[in-house]
C-alpha cells in the first residue's frame, strides 16, 4: 500500500503526539530498544532505497493530476475537465455538471474571478432536423398556447381568490357580526346585489384583511418585545442575586464557613439537614412563589418553543412567493392557503367582534327587561293619573276659551278680554305640547326593551368588552380565594400573568408616554413644515404679486378674480413664485459668504455648516422659538421685497414708462407650447453652463466690497486677507497686521458690537494687560471705545444704505435694459416668412436682450485683456478661430433647432392633425411655427430617450454613442463634417423620405390611374397614414418572422435538445449556434461593435490631446 505525503505527515504527527503525551515511556523504550520503529516511516530504510522512494514522491507531487475547482475530483472519460475561462492554477479546470449546478445556484453567467462569460452550445439528438416538420411545429404551437392559456387561467384564478373572494367573504363576515336578526341579514344581502357594491365590498374587504395582517404582525412584535423585556429583567435579577450572594459570602464568619465545610463532610448529617431545610423552604411563601414562577416560565418556554419551532420550520421550508400565492404547485395548496386565511380572519373577527357584540346585546337586553319589569307598574299608574289630569285641564281650558271668544266677538277684542284670550290660547298650545311629550315618553317607557336593542353598535361592543374584563377579574379573584382557603397567602406575585402585567405596567406607561411624545413631535414638525414650506412661500408670492402688479398692467381685482375662479392654480403659481424668491435670497447669501470674511454674517444660519441640522432644530426647539423665528422671517422678507422689488419696479416705471406694462401672456400660439421649454430647457441651462454666473457675480461682489469697504474703512472687517491666513497657518504672522483688525469672538447679539477694529497702539494693550494706577486712563479708554463703537455702527449703516441703493439701481436696470434691447432685436423676427407676423413676447425679449448684453460685455472684456497684454495677433487669431466656430456651430444649430423640428412637425401634422381636423374637400393650412414648436418637443423627447440607459425598442444605441461623442467634443472642438454626415444628414434624409414619398405617390402616381378628384383628394389626405401603415406592417412582419423563428427554435429545443456543451477558453463556438441567432441579435452585435469603435476613437483622441 502506497502512502501519500499527507498520510505520512499525519502518521508522523500522530506518532509525535504519542511521544509528547508519554515522554517517559517513549524515552525509555527508545533507549532500551533502538531497533523499534521510529515515527518517520523512512528512517530505517536503506539510504538508496530512501532516496529513490523520496524522489518518487516528489515526482508524484510535481505531476499532480488536474482536479475540478468545485468538487476537487479529477476528470474521467464520461465527465472530462474543461477550462472555460481565463483562470489558471488550481481553479483552471471544472466539470461541466459542477459548473451548471453552481450557475443555477448563483444565477451568474460569467466567472467570478476573471469575469469571462462562459460559452455554451446546444447539443441535439441525432435525429434532430434543422427545420421542424409542419405537423410538429403546429403541435408545438398548440402546446405553447396551452401553457400560456393555462398560465393566464391560473393567474386569473389566483387574482380572483386573493383579490375578490377572500376580501368579499371577510367583509361580509364583518357585516354579519353586527346583524341582530336573520331578517335583517336577508334584507342587507338583498340590498347589496349589484356590481358596483360588490366591487366596493371587495375593496373594503381587502383593506380589512390587510388590517388584520398588520394587527397580527403588531401582536407578534409586542410578544417578542415583552419576551425581550422579561429576559432582560431575569438577567438583572440573576446578577443582583449573584452580587448579594457574593457580598453575603464575604461577610460570612470563618467559623460558619468551617461548619459548612464540616457539614459537607458528614453525609448523613448533611442529608438530614438538607431535608429539614427543604421542608422549611417549601413552607416559605417566597420559595413557593419562586417555584410557581419556574413552572410558569417552563410552560411559557414550552409554548414559545412550539411557536419558534413552527417559525423555524417555516424558515427551513422557505416557500417561494409564487407557490405561496398559488401560481406554482398544486391547486390544492392554493385552496388550502385560502381557507387558512379565511379561517384566521373568521376566528379573529369572531373573537374580536362577534363574541363581545353578542355578549353586549344579551346584557343590554336583560338590563332593559329588568328595568321595565321593576318600574313598569309605578310608571303606568303615574302616567294614568297624569293623563287624566291633563285631559280635565284641557277640557276646562277649551270651555273657557270658547266663552271668552263669544264675549270678544262683539268688538271688544282690543281690551282686557282680548289679552286674556291670547293668554289662554298660548296655555292651550303649551298644554297640547306637554300632552304630546308625555305620550311620547309613555311610548318610550313602554317599549324600553325595543329601544335598548337599538343602541349603537359601538356602545354594545363596549358593553361586551367590559363584561369580558369583568369575567377575567372575577375568575382571578375566585382563584385567589380558593388558594387562600387552602392556606396559601394572597400575594400579587403568585399569579405569573398578574406579575407580568404589574411589572409591565410602568414599562407600558413609559412606552405610551414616549409614543405620545413622538406623536406630538411629529405633529409639531409637520405643522412647522407646513408653515415654513407652504404658508410662508405662499405669503411671499402674494406679496411679490402685490408689489409687481403694476408692472404687468393688472390690478388686484384681476388677481382676486383669478383666485376665485381657480384657487388651486392661483395658489400654486404664487407658491412657486415665493419659493423661487426664497431660493434666490438663499443663493445670494451663500455668494456673500463666499466673498466676505468668516464671521461677518454670523447672525444668519449657514446651511453648509456640518453642525447645522434643520430637522434637529425643528424637533428640539420649542414652538414659541419657531413662532418668533417665523415672525422675524416675515418681517425681513417683507421688507426685502419692498426695498428690492417694489421700489425698483417703481423706479423702472419712472425711468422708462414706454416699455410698461410687460406682456408675458402665453395665449399666443407661438409661445403656447415652447415658451417654458425654451426658457427652462435651453436658455437657462445654456446661461448657467457657459456664462458662469456664480463666478461672475462673486467677482462683482468682491470688487464692490473692496471699493466701498476702502471708502468706509471697513476693508479689514469685511474681506479676508490672504496674508492673515498664511500667518495663522505658519504661526509667524506679523503681530501688527494681526492686531489691526482684531475681532472679539463673543456670542449673541454683542458680537457685532464687539467686532471693532483696534488701533495699533501698544500702550493701549499695556494698559489693558497691566495694572493701572489712576481711573482717568480707564475713563479715556472707555470714551475712546464708545467713540470707536459709534463710528463703526455709523459706517455699517452707511454700508447697508449704499448696498441698498446699488441693488435698487441694479434691479431697475435689469428690468429696463434687457427688455428694451430684446424688444429691438425681437422686432426683426416677424419679418421672417415662417413667423406670419407673430407679436413680441417679453419673456423672449428679456432672454434675447440678456444674451446680447452678456455677449457684448464678454467680447469687450476679452478684447481688452488681449490688447492690454499686447497680444493683438493672438487676439486676431482667436477672433478668426471663434468666427469659424460660431459659423460652423450656427449652421449646425440652425439645422438642428429649426429645420429638423419643422420637418418633424410637418410629418406629425400630416399624419395626425390634418386627417382628423380638415375635411377632404378643403385644403389644409400649415402654420410652420406651430409645426416647429411640436417638432422641437418631439426632438427633445427623442434625444432624452436616446440618452437614457434603458433599452427601448424605438431607440438605437448607435445614436447614444454619437451624442456622447458630440458631448465629449464640446462647443469648441466640434467636428462639423462628422456631425453633418453621421447625425444631421441621416435624420434629414429619413424625414424627407417620409414626407416626399407619400406626396409623390399621391400627387404624381395615383392621379395617372384616372380616378375622380374627390378620390385623389382623399388619397392625398391619407397618403401619409397609408405609408405609415405599410411601414408598420413591414416592421411587424419582420418582428413576427423573428418571433416565429425563435418559437421554432424553442419548440425544437423542447423536443430534441439533450444538453449543452461547455466550450473551453478560446475555443470557437459551434456553427449552428450562430445560425440559430436572430437577426435582431446580429443587429445588436453590429451596434455594439460600432459603439466600441466610437469609444476607441474617443480614447485615442483624448490621448493625442493629452500628448499635445
Swiss-Prot record:
Disruption phenotype: Semiglossy stem. Elevated drought tolerance and reduced transpiration rate. Elevated amounts of 18-carbon-length cutin monomers and shift in the cuticular wax profile toward the very-long-chain free fatty acids tetracosanoic acid (C24) and hexacosanoic acid (C26).
Effect the entry attributes to changing residue 218 to R: In sud1-1; No visible phenotype except glossy shoots, but is able to suppress the dry2 phenotype
Compositionally biased tracts (Low complexity): 10-44
Annotated S-S bridges: none
Transmembrane domains' residue ranges: 157-177, 197-217, 339-359, 362-382, 462-482, 489-509, 525-545, 572-592, 630-650, 669-689, 796-816, 844-864, 894-914, 923-943, 982-1002, 1017-1036
Class of the enzyme per the UniProt entry, highest EC level: transferase
Chain positions of all zinc fingers (RING-CH-type): 60-121
Domain remarks in the Swiss-Prot or TrEMBL record: The RING-CH-type zinc finger domain is required for E3 ligase activity.
Its job: Probable E3 ubiquitin ligase acting as a positive post-transcriptional regulator of 3-hydroxy-3-methylglutaryl-coenzyme A reductase activity. Might be involved in the quality control that degrades misfolded proteins.
Name of the protein: Probable E3 ubiquitin ligase SUD1
Species for this entry: Arabidopsis thaliana (Mouse-ear cress)
Name of the gene: SUD1
Amino acid at each position: 500500500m502506497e502512502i501519500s505525503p499527507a498520510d505520512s505527515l499525519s502518521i508522523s504527527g500522530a506518532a509525535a503526539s504519542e511521544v509528547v503525551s508519554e515522554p517517559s515511556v517513549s524515552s525509555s523504550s527508545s533507549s532500551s530498544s533502538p531497533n523499534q520503529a521510529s515515527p518517520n516511516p523512512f528512517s530505517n530504510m536503506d539510504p538508496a532505497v530512501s532516496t529513490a522512494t523520496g524522489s518518487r514522491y516528489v515526482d508524484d507531487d510535481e505531476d499532480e493530476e488536474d482536479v475540478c475547482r468545485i468538487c476537487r475530483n479529477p476528470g474521467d472519460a464520461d465527465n472530462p475537465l474543461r477550462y472555460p475561462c481565463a483562470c489558471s492554477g488550481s481553479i483552471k479546470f471544472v466539470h461541466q455538471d459542477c459548473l451548471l449546478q453552481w450557475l443555477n445556484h448563483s444565477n451568474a453567467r460569467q466567472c467570478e474571478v476573471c469575469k469571462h462569460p462562459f460559452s455554451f452550445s446546444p447539443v441535439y439528438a441525432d435525429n434532430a432536423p434543422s427545420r421542424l416538420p409542419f405537423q410538429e411545429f403546429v403541435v408545438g404551437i398548440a402546446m405553447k398556447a396551452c401553457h400560456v392559456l393555462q398560465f393566464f387561467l391560473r393567474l386569473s384564478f389566483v387574482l380572483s381568490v386573493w383579490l375578490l373572494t377572500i376580501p368579499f367573504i371577510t367583509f361580509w363576515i364583518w357585516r354579519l357580526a353586527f346583524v341582530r336578526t336573520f331578517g335583517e341579514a336577508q334584507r342587507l344581502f338583498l340590498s347589496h346585489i349589484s356590481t358596483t357594491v360588490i366591487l366596493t365590498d371587495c375593496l373594503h374587504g381587502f383593506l380589512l384583511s390587510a388590517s388584520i395582517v398588520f394587527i397580527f404582525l403588531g401582536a407578534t412584535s409586542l410578544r417578542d418585545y415583552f419576551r425581550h423585556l422579561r429576559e432582560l429583567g431575569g438577567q438583572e435579577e440573576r446578577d443582583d442575586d449573584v452580587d448579594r450572594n457574593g457580598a453575603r459570602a464575604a461577610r460570612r464568619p470563618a467559623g460558619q464557613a468551617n461548619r459548612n465545610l464540616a457539614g459537607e463532610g458528614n453525609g448523613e448529617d448533611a442529608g438530614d439537614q438538607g431535608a429539614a431545610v427543604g421542608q422549611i423552604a417549601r413552607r416559605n411563601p417566597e420559595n413557593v412563589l419562586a417555584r410557581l414562577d419556574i413552572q410558569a416560565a417552563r410552560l411559557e418556554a414550552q409554548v414559545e418553543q412550539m411557536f419558534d419551532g413552527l417559525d423555524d420550520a417555516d424558515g427551513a421550508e422557505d416557500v417561494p412567493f409564487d407557490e405561496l400565492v398559488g401560481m406554482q404547485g398544486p391547486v390544492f395548496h392554493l385552496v388550502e392557503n385560502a381557507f387558512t386565511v379565511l379561517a384566521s380572519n373568521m376566528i379573529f373577527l369572531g373573537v374580536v367582534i362577534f363574541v363581545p357584540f353578542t355578549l353586549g346585546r344579551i346584557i343590554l337586553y336583560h338590563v332593559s327587561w329588568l328595568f321595565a319589569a321593576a318600574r313598569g307598574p309605578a310608571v303606568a299608574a303615574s302616567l294614568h293619573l297624569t293623563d287624566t289630569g291633563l285631559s280635565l285641564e284641557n277640557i276646562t281650558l277649551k270651555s273657557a276659551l270658547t266663552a271668552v271668544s263669544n264675549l270678544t266677538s262683539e268688538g271688544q277684542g282690543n281690551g282686557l278680554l282680548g289679552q286674556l284670550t291670547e293668554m289662554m290660547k298660548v296655555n292651550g298650545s303649551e298644554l297640547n305640547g306637554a300632552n304630546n311629550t308625555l305620550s311620547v315618553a309613555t311610548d318610550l317607557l313602554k317599549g324600553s326593551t325595543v329601544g335598548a336593542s337599538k343602541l349603537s353598535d359601538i356602545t354594545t361592543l363596549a358593553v361586551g368588552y367590559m363584561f369580558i374584563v369583568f369575567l377575567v377579574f372575577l375568575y382571578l379573584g375566585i382563584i385567589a380565594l380558593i388558594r387562600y382557603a387552602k392556606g396559601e397567602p394572597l400575594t400579587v406575585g403568585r399569579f405569573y400573568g398578574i406579575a407580568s402585567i404589574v411589572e409591565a405596567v410602568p414599562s407600558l406607561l413609559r412606552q405610551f408616554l414616549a409614543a405620545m411624545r413622538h406623536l406630538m413631535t411629529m405633529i409639531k414638525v409637520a405643522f412647522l413644515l407646513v408653515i415654513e414650506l407652504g404658508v410662508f412661500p405662499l405669503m411671499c408670492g402674494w406679496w411679490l404679486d402685490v408689489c409687481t402688479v403694476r408692472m404687468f398692467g393688472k390690478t388686484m381685482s384681476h388677481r382676486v378674480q383669478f383666485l376665485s375662479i381657480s384657487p388651486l392654480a392661483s395658489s400654486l403659481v404664487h407658491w412657486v413664485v415665493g419659493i423661487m424668491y426664497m431660493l434666490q435670497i438663499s443663493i445670494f447669501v451663500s455668494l456673500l459668504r463666499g466673498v466676505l470674511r468668516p464671521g461677518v454674517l454670523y447672525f444668519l444660519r449657514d446651511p453648509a455648516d456640518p453642525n447645522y441640522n434643520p430637522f434637529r432644530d425643528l424637533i428640539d426647539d420649542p414652538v414659541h422659538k419657531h413662532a418668533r423665528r417665523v415672525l422675524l422671517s416675515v418681517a425681513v422678507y417683507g421688507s426685502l421685497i419692498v426695498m428690492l422689488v417694489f421700489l425698483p419696479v417703481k423706479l423702472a416705471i419712472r425711468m422708462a414708462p414706454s416699455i410698461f406694462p410687460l406682456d408675458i401672456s402665453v395665449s399666443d400660439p407661438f409661445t403656447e407650447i415652447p415658451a417654458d421649454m425654451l426658457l427652462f430647457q435651453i436658455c437657462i441651462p445654456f446661461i448657467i453652463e457657459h456664462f458662469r454666473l456664480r463666478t461672475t457675480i462673486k467677482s462683482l461682489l468682491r470688487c464692490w466690497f473692496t471699493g466701498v469697504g476702502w471708502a468706509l474703512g471697513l476693508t479689514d472687517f469685511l474681506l479676508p486677507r490672504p496674508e492673515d491666513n498664511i500667518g495663522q497657518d505658519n504661526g509667524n504672522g506679523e503681530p501688527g497686521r494681526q492686531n489691526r483688525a482684531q475681532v472679539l469672538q463673543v456670542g449673541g447679539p454683542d458680537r457685532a458690537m464687539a467686532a471693532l477694529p483696534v488701533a495699533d497702539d501698544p500702550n493701549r494693550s499695556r494698559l489693558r494687560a497691566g495694572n493701572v494706577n489712576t481711573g482717568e486712563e480707564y475713563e479715556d479708554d472707555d470714551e475712546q471705545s464708545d467713540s470707536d463703537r459709534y463710528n463703526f455702527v455709523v459706517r455699517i449703516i452707511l454700508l447697508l444704505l449704499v448696498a441698498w441703493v446699488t441693488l435698487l439701481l441694479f434691479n431697475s436696470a435689469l428690468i429696463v435694459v434687457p427688455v428694451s434691447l430684446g424688444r429691438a432685436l425681437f422686432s426683426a423676427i416677424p419679418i421672417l416668412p415662417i413667423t406670419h407676423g407673430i407679436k413680441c413676447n417679453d419673456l423672449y425679449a428679456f432672454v434675447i436682450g440678456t444674451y446680447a448684453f452678456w455677449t457684448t460685455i464678454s467680447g469687450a472684456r476679452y478684447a481688452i485683456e488681449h490688447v492690454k497684454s499686447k497680444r493683438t495677433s493672438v487676439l486676431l487669431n482667436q477672433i478668426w478661430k471663434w468666427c469659424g466656430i460660431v459659423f460652423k456651430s450656427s449652421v449646425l444649430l440652425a439645422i438642428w433647432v429649426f429645420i429638423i423640428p419643422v420637418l418633424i412637425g410637418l410629418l406629425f401634422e400630416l399624419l395626425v392633425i390634418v386627417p382628423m381636423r380638415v375635411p377632404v374637400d378643403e385644403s389644409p393650412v400649415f402654420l410652420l411655427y406651430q409645426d416647429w414648436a411640436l417638432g422641437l418637443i418631439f426632438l427633445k423627447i427623442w434625444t432624452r430617450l436616446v440618452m437614457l440607459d434603458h433599452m427601448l425598442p424605438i431607440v438605437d444605441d448607435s445614436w447614444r454613442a454619437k451624442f456622447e461623442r458630440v458631448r465629449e467634443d464640446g462647443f469648441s472642438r466640434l467636428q462639423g463634417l462628422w456631425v453633418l454626415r453621421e447625425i444631421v444628414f441621416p435624420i434629414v434624409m429619413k424625414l424627407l423620405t417620409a414626407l416626399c414619398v407619400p406626396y409623390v405617390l399621391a400627387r404624381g402616381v395615383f392621379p395617372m390611374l384616372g380616378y375622380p378628384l374627390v378620390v385623389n383628394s382623399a388619397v392625398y389626405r391619407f397618403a401619409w397614414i397609408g405609408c405609415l401603415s405599410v411601414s408598420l406592417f413591414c416592421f411587424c412582419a419582420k418582428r413576427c418572422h423573428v418571433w416565429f423563428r425563435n418559437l421554432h427554435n424553442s419548440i425544437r429545443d423542447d423536443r430534441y435538445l439533450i444538453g449543452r456543451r461547455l466550450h473551453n477558453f478560446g475555443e470557437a463556438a459551434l456553427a449552428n449556434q450562430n445560425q440559430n441567432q436572430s437577426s435582431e441579435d446580429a443587429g445588436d452585435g453590429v451596434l455594439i461593435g460600432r459603439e466600441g469603435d466610437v469609444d476607441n476613437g474617443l480614447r485615442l483622441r483624448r490621448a493625442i490631446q493629452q500628448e499635445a
